[in-house]
Each structure stands twice: as structure tokens, then as C-alpha cells.
């Protein structure tokens, strides 16, 4: 007892971490020293608390549920093997201007387990570490732990609009979040897939748009069905959460020290709203735009009514308002929007969006709440008290933090859990990107060391996001979440993370425990990893040669620029990054490689990517041409195919073999009537 209390006081005075490997705990504790022996938990092992009240009642119930033990008020004599939870009345430790209410110590000896903290949240997290140290069902490995998180915000987002997930499923995920010390559940409740929240003032939201005509997202959304229906209609698919169910879920989360943050999308991503209330669009018609009309005052009356009920249900500090991917096209020609721009002295539709966001923020602030939104809320002007969720990359979040805004980092390249986590053609359908466990674990939210002190103050944490366009079932959702959510948990909690191999080993142990708890997951033991061809540079006659683009790549998918197709690096599974180049529209890809001199050719090959979830398809037409002077070309091979190959994902080459002489090698690739992207990595010449 005394040495653990001394360790607590020493940590308050000095926050310099010591790296000691944990046995099997995720996230890795700040300090953990393993020792020999075990504490054996028996059915009659008493648990003592030194505090009372509602928090004590909740703690007792949780201990009964997870450990099956009775809890008592008071202190047992030292000869009785017991588990002791002590709430300390001392000042919280602090660092970078933040206090750490989740700090705890855990001391396990063969005779006693002692958890101490100055908050019940810290005691709760000490219990999670205790649970993870258990082996053989009832033995807890002896250890001494001093622990606290790096960031106060460690979150998971679940999209329940594209596909509806039951309250029971959400509670199961809240249990897993608590086990891995995640403390923010971002609940994506509204979007084009359906409105999921009962709003008593506007009953049509659930009556008209909580259900849709089919569950297949590709057929319903991508093939432009997009019709909503009533719950009793034949084939109706969807659902919604009653206000009583929401209250129950919020309370369930709170007992696990998790804050639920609701997201109500605006001004974009609101197709479903207008099927119920078409007067809120610029044209006053349903199915014409995904955006609210900022020039229409009735829009703000509606949203304030919705948000009033949202705030009554969710006591969270933040209300997430989306703010991403607003189309804005209708605003450019809408008389009401143009009048609003004129009246408010705005420059363009970006500033009109900023006006919209700031007006909503003022309403939330007036009710004691803060606005949180995706990083597009920075377009035009950022609302003065808004917090930013940085998803398009890291720059927006860093910019907002340097300007004194609170930020949650969740860049898609590391934190989007709807993307493939292993070789795509071995995996269930996903959104097309590639975020394996190692990539998620490698994320460093504060990579700019020169301004680390400022960033530490305003970057609140990290979040893993599961969008569910391609995730229709609970089993699929868990498969996408785990184990990558464990990496997010450790990134958010542990300042000095161990090497990936260490984390991977601990994760495999954690997954074995999750299996016993009934979770589905991707089995790391079966992981195949990166594309083999991408690991070794390839040498060929066109390596480093100049490329002239007669039809250029898009800047968004530029690879490394003009040298991408001849840099000797073949693409990995992910279409983003610097290995692939993306082309769209018109002739799509038309590139000429200058070999520098007339050269004898025997083979030309280029890999093309198909990833249907993100509208990338193997080209309908590919042609290889050669020239001696760069003016007059001869076609060596042309491949014309209709888009009959409907596989979700593959990488295949277009290859010519033969004999020819040329200085210039030209490769053309384009799509037919169906359109879509062309992605190519390297044009190899031998």
C-alpha cells in the first residue's frame, strides 16, 4: 500500500515516463513492472471500496458483472486476500496544462490487489488493466502499474445511417471500448442512408426516412435508387432509435466512463431530411440536393428544434454537426442564398457555409454546448469556439490547433476502419483503401515536434471511424473494427509506444480474450501483408526516363508527379499515396515515355487497379504505341473490353511481348460509357 501511494505522489511530481514492457495489456501502460507470482481470485474474494454514493453503486454492479465478486464498504484486515479500490483525495496530476482524471495505480501481490486513483474513472481503468492481467480464468499476474493516458479523447465512430445497428450491438461495442480504455463514442445518426433518431417535434423524420427500399448499398445508393419508404412497406430496410433507447445507451456508456457524442449532419449529407421536409432545400423539392438552404430561415428553425431535443438526450460537451462535403452547387443559383450572401457581406458559398456553421455554433454555445465538426468547417472562416475533427489529412487539424482550436485527429490514411486491412481480394467488401494494423499503429498525432507544446495543449486525441456503406452486418462491423481499434486505443493512451512487433504480439493475446467474449475479428495469424511486388524496386529500360502527359493525372492522385510511372516502384494495395497515379475524364491516361534513343523493345507491361467501391475500374480500352520521332506512332497492341469483370478488387497487367524498335513508348488507357477512374503504377519496358 505505502509503496503504491508513494509512486502516485512521485508521478504527480515527475511525468517523465519509463518504458517497461507489459505482459499482455492494451493499451500499454505508462509504467508497468511485472513480478513473479499471482493473486488468485476466488468466489469469496472480497472487494472493498472506500467511497459511497451512486458511483460506488455503479462500480459494485460492474465488478459483479465482470468479475463475479461481491463488493463491501470498508477495509479488511491485511491477512485477508482482498481487492481494494481506494479513491484518493489529492490533486490531480497535470501536464501541458491538462489534468489527468484517468490516472491510476495498480499493485498486485500474491496477497492483495490495490487500485488507487483520485477519480472513479481512474479506478475503473485500473480494473480494466487487472482484467487484462488475468490468466487461467482466475489468476492475476503480479505487477506494479502507474498509468495515465496521453490524450483525454480516445474515440470510436460508428455510422448507423448507412446501416442500422441495434442498441444491443452498440452496448457490446461500448463494453469493448471500456476494456481498451476508449472514452468517446461518436454516434453518426443521420445521413443519406436514413435518419435514425426519434425527434418528437419532427415525427416525419423517422416516419418517412428511417427506412429505405433495400439493404444493398450499391444498388440503393450507387445505382441511384435512393428511395425511402415506410416501416410496413414490403422490403423496407432500416430502423431508428427511440428517445428511451438513446437515454438507456447514454446511461450504459456513462457507467463505463464513455461519453456519447451525437452527430447530426448539416449543411450537407442530408438527403433523407428533404424526403420528409422538402421545403428545407433551395428548390423546395425532395431528391434535388443533399444540402440545406442557408438562405432559408426555416432551416435554422428546424435545426434548432432538432438540436434542442438532441441536447436533452445527450449531456456531452460537444455536439457534432458534420459539416463535411457540402455540395454547395444549388447555393450558387438560389435567390435566397445569394440574398443571404449579399446581406451578410459574404464573398462566396464557402463563406456562406461558414455563416451557417457559426449560426449553429452560436445556438449551441447559448445552451452551454460546443460545436464539433469535420475539417471542412474551416472553409471560409472557422467558427470562434468550434473544435475540429481532422479527417482529410493532418494539415487542417494542425492548422486549427496552432490557431487555438481544440482538435481530434482522425486522418483517413490511418484511422478509417472501413478500408481493407489485408490483401483486398481475400477480404470482405470494403471502401477501397488499405489500412492494415501496422499502419494504424504507426500514427503519430503530433508529428511536428517544433510546435509540440502548443499542439499538446489543443490536440485532444484520436478516433477510429467505421463508415458502413459496405458493412451491412454486425459480424462484418466487428471484423472491421478489431483489431485496428486496439491500435487507435494505444495511440491515444500511450506516449512512448513499443515497437509494432511487441504490439502485434499483445494484440494476438487480446484477440484470444475477445473471442472468448464473443467478438468477431480479423485474425492476425492469417495476415498476408503488403503487396510483394511493391517491396522491391524494379529495374527496366524506362527507369528514370522523362514522361510527357498528353492527358494528365489528377492532382489529388498524382503519385510523386511526372516521374511516378518510371520511378521503379510498383503500387501497393492502396490507391492513395505516392505509388499510383489516377486519371479520369476524356482520354483518361495518355502518357509518352522518352527512352532517349531508339531502343530495341521486347516487352512493355503496366499494372492497372480495379477497386469498384471507389469507382476505379480496369480500363475498357488500353493501347500501346511506339514512335521513332515522337510524331508518328504505330500501334503494337490494343485491348478493348467491356466492363464485364465485376470483381470488387484486383490488380492485373496489360502486357505486350514481341520485338520492336522505338525511342518513344506511348500508353493510352480510358474508360467507356460507364466512366470511372484509371489507376496505373509503373510502365515497365524491357
What are the residue ranges of the model-derived segments?
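Aromatic, loop-rich ligand-recognition surfaces of beta-strand-rich domains
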Residues: 572-637, 648-686
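Active-site neighborhood of glycoside hydrolase catalytic domains
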Residues: 273, 279-283, 287-384, 391-398
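Contiguous, structured surface segment used for ligand recognition
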Residues: 22-151, 476, 488, 492-522
Amino acid at each position: 500500500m505505502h509503496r503504491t501511494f508513494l509512486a502516485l505522489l512521485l508521478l504527480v511530481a515527475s511525468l517523465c515516463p519509463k518504458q517497461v514492457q507489459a505482459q499482455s495489456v492494451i493499451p500499454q501502460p505508462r509504467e508497468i513492472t511485472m513480478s513473479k507470482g499471482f493473486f488468485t481470485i476466488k468466489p469469496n474474494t472480497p472487494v472493498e471500496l472506500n467511497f459511497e454514493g451512486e458511483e460506488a453503486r455503479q462500480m459494485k454492479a460492474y465488478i459483479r458483472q465482470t468479475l463475479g465478486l461481491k463488493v463491501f464498504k470498508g477495509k479488511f484486515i491485511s491477512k485477508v486476500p482482498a481487492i481494494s479500490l481506494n479513491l484518493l483525495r489529492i490533486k490531480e496530476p497535470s501536464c501541458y496544462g491538462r489534468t489527468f482524471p484517468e490516472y491510476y495505480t495498480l499493485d498486485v501481490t500474491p496477497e492483495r490487489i490495490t487500485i488507487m486513483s483520485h477519480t472513479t474513472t481512474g479506478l475503473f481503468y485500473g480494473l480494466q488493466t487487472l482484467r487484462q492481467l488475468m490468466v487461467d480464468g482466475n489468476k492475476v499476474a503480479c505487477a506494479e502499474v502507474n498509468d495515465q493516458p496521453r490524450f483525454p479523447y480516445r474515440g470510436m465512430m460508428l455510422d448507423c445511417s448507412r446501416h442500422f445497428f441495434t442498441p444491443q450491438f452498440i452496448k457490446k461495442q461500448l463494453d469493448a471500448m471500456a476494456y481498451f480504455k476508449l472514452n468517446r463514442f461518436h454516434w453518426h445518426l443521420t445521413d443519406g442512408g436514413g435518419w435514425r433518431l426519434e425527434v418528437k417535434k419532427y415525427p416525419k423524420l423517422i416516419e418517412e426516412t428511417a427506412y429505405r427500399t433495400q439493404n444493398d448499398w450499391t444498388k440503393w445508393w450507387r445505382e441511384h435508387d435512393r428511395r425511402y419508404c415506410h416501416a410496413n412497406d414490403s422490403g423496407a430496410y432500416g430502423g431508428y432509435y427511440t428517445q428511451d433507447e438513446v437515454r438507456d445507451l447514454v446511461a450504459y456508456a456513462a457507467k463505463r466512463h464513455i461519453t456519447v457524442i451525437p452527430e447530426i449532419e448539416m449543411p450537407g449529407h442530408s438527403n433523407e431530411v428533404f424526403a420528409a421536409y422538402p421545403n428545407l432545400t433551395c428548390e423546395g423539392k425532395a431528391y434535388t440536393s443533399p444540402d440545406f438552404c442557408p438562405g432559408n430561415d426555416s432551416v435554422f428553425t428546424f435545426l434548432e428544434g432538432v438540436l434542442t431535443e438532441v441536447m436533452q438526450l445527450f449531456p456531452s460537451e460537444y455536439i457534432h454537426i458534420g459539416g463535411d462535403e457540402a455540395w454547395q452547387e444549388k447555393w450558387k443559383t438560389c435567390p435566397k442564398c445569394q440574398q443571404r450572401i449579399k446581406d451578410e457581406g459574404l464573398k462566396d458559398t464557402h463563406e456562406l457555409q461558414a455563416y451557417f456553421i457559426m449560426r449553429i455554433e452560436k445556438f449551441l454555445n447559448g445552451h452551454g454546448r460546443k460545436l464539433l465538426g469535420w475539417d471542412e468547417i474551416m472553409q471560409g472562416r472557422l467558427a470562434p469556439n468550434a473544435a475540429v475533427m481532422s479527417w482529410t489529412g493532418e494539415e487542417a487539424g494542425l492548422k486549427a490547433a496552432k490557431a487555438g482550436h481544440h482538435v481530434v485527429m482522425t486522418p483517413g490514411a490511418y484511422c478509417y476502419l472501413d478500408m481493407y486491412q489485408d490483401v483486398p481480394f481475400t477480404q470482405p467488401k470494403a471502401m477501397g483503401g488499405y489500412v492494415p494494423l501496422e499502419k494504424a499503429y504507426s500514427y503519430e498525432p503530433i508529428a511536428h515536434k517544433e510546435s509540440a507544446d502548443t499542439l499538446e495543449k489543443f490536440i485532444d486525441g484520436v478516433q477510429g471511424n467505421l463508415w458502413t456503406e459496405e458493412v451491412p452486418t454486425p459480424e462484418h462491423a466487428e471484423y472491421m473494427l478489431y483489431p485496428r481499434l486496439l491500435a487507435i486505443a494505444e495511440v491515444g493512451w500511450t506516449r512512448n509506444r513499443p515497437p509494432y512487433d511487441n504490439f502485434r504480439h499483445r494484440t494476438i493475446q487480446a484477440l484470444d480474450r475477445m473471442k472468448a467474449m464473443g467478438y468477431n475479428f480479423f485474425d492476425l495469424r492469417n495476415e498476408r501483408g503488403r503487396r510483394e511486388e511493391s517491396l522491391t524496386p524494379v529495374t527496366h529500360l524506362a527507369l528514370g526516363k522523362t514522361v510527357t502527359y498528353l492527358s494528365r493525372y489528377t492532382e489529388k492522385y498524382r503519385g510523386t508527379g511526372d516521374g511516378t510511372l518510371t520511378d521503379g516502384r510498383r503500387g501497393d494495395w492502396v490507391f492513395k499515396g505516392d505509388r499510383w497515379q489516377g486519371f479520369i475524364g476524356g482520354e483518361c491516361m495518355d502518357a509518352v515515355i522518352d527512352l532517349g534513343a531508339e531502343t530495341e523493345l521486347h516487352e512493355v507491361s503496366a499494372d492497372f487497379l480495379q477497386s469498384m467501391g471507389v469507382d476505379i475500374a480496369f480500363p475498357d480500352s488500353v493501347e500501346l504505341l511506339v514512335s521513332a520521332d515522337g510524331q508518328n506512332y504505330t500501334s503494337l497492341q490494343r485491348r478493348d473490353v467491356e466492363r464485364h469483370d465485376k470483381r470488387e478488387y484486383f490488380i492485373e497487367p496489360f502486357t505486350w511481348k514481341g520485338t520492336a524498335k522505338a525511342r518513344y513508348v506511348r500508353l493510352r488507357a480510358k474508360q467507356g460509357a460507364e466512366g470511372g477512374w484509371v489507376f496505373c503504377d509503373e510502365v515497365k519496358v524491357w
